[in-house]
Amino acid sequence: MRKITIRALLLCSLLLVFHTSAAAELQAQEGHLMIPGDTDTALETVDDERFFECTFECDIKKEGKPCKPKGCKCDDKDNKDHKKCSGGWRCKLKLCLKF
């Protein structure tokens, strides 16, 4: 009976140590999280507009029609994979990604 009690106590203490260390790590990470109210809304608006433009570009490109929406530059009209948008947005695999 003693062995079972000792094992149970050791297991509980290990779980407590693991839980405490995980909670401390999570608390440390919370300091690095961005709070939505603290961001610059003007910058978010510009990024949203660029994302919309690039999504629009990818949709048109998917249909096979030529396109050059506002803010997007086309290096090579024949090569669809090299079409880039200003601000770090690129069309890749019919998706728009920010680099």
Curated annotation (Swiss-Prot):
Subcellular location(s) of the protein: Secreted
A Pfam family per the record: Toxin_20
This protein's GO CC annotations: extracellular region
Cysteine pairs bridged by disulfides in the record: C54-C67, C58-C91, C72-C74, C85-C96
Tissues/organs with expression: Expressed by the venom gland.
Major location (coarse): secreted
InterPro entries in the record: Hwtx-2-like
Record-level Gene Ontology MF annotations: toxin activity
Leader sequence segment: 1-23
Entry function: Toxin that causes irreversible contractile paralysis into adult Aedes aegypti resulting in 100% mortality after 24 hours.
Family: Belongs to the neurotoxin 12 (Hwtx-2) family. 04 (lasiotoxin) subfamily.
Protein name: U1-theraphotoxin-Lsp1c
Source species of the chain: Lasiodora sp. (strain IBSP 8539) (Brazilian salmon pink birdeater)
Lineage, broadest ranks: Eukaryota, Metazoa, Ecdysozoa, Arthropoda, Chelicerata
